[in-house]
Amino acid sequence: MVKLTSIAAGVAAIAAGASAAATTTLSQSDERVNLVELGVYVSDIRAHLAEYYSF
């Protein structure tokens, strides 16, 4: 399982790279894209954990 620190590092790297090359398009299979998606999923699960357990 990917640690949240590596997700945060990936997001920070993308943010730093985005400011340097704002027009760069990443492919869907790029690891940085996958790390951001995973970070969003983890954040959503944490925010709605009680709702998930209620089902």
From Swiss-Prot:
PANTHER family: CELL WALL PROTEIN CWP1-RELATED, SERIPAUPERIN. InterPro entries: SRP1_TIP1 (IPR000992), Yeast_SRP1/TIP1_CWP (IPR050788). Residues 1-20 form the signal peptide. Coiled coil: none annotated. This is Seripauperin-7. Keywords: Signal. It comes from the Eukaryota. Belongs to the SRP1/TIP1 family. Seripauperin subfamily.
